[in-house]
Amino acid sequence: MNLEKYILAVITTNPNKVSGGTASFICETKEEMEFVAGNLEAILDGIAHGLGEEMYVIVKH
């Protein structure tokens, strides 16, 4: 089995929305969350997707 799509990281302002399984980053503000998501997108060579107002996921396609 070859995984082609997977979640690299989760970035959120609401720690109650995250459980284990991948790298999680808890931010204090929406602006900080967007900044962290943008940087992780570049660092991890992934794509950031917003899931509502409180969460981004970085995925590898």
Summary of predicted features, one role per range:
Residues 44-61:
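Short, compact, well-ordered microdomains
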Residues 1-46:
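N-terminal non-globular leader segments, chiefly Sec-dependent signal peptides
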